[in-house]
Amino acid sequence: MDNFARFVDLVVNDVTYLMDRSLNELAQIHNIETEMESAQEWAAKSPQYRREQEGALRSLERYAPGRITLGRLTVNLLKLLTAETKTPFMVPEIVGKLAAMLDYNLGALAGPKCRNLKVRNPEKYKFDPRVLLSDIVQVFLNLSDEKNFVRAVAEDGRNYKKGLFEGTVEILRRRMITTENEIEKLLAFVCKVEALETILEEEGLGQAPEEFSGTPYFNARFVIPFLTDVVGTLDRDRGQGHDQVAFAFGPEGPV
């Protein structure tokens, strides 16, 4: 890697660490505040346990805002960098962990576990989930035309889920976080990921179409009609299954 690619690698590592740490601390704050909500149940805890939890909360109140702020700033830096240049993010040493980090954090902010980030006073901790979600989505959009990135997301079997992106779209629309053009671009990106994921599965089964032999990416002759079918599927499925996801930005989410 050249010097700038090394810098990009450090930025991705910093975002990964700071987001994981800050969201984990928000979840801890949520858990302690939830315990304290019932005065009767809290009073039933042992004095030592209450002291320990209250001390942990004071410590989190002291240190979490700084880490959350750093996390937000590094995500914003990532958004700005990916808007200006793509190539350094596409090197094999970076693109896979970048895709996994983005998928994971999208899940944390817009997936079922987002309710764990709901705290009594998010402003106190410098936590703005709308801004974080908007910036992470923008990174996806900035890289959405890069074949290496599409492939990296398609290969992220642990974190990538089509339903998560569909749920994110519902949040973006409901909260008017981004424009309809950007939402359509995000849905088109999901179509590309789904198409390539299917192709990769066929390759794994030895059933890849002949025109894909010897190439790691998709061929326009196959993908254009395939994406048309996928878009139709997305349109049909868009209203299904969302009631099973506790979206952030709803009554049970962090805002």
Describe the residue ranges of each PLM region.
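Small Cys/His zinc-coordinating "RING-like" fingers
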Residues: 213-253
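Extended alpha-helical scaffold domains
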Residues: 1-214, 218, 222, 246
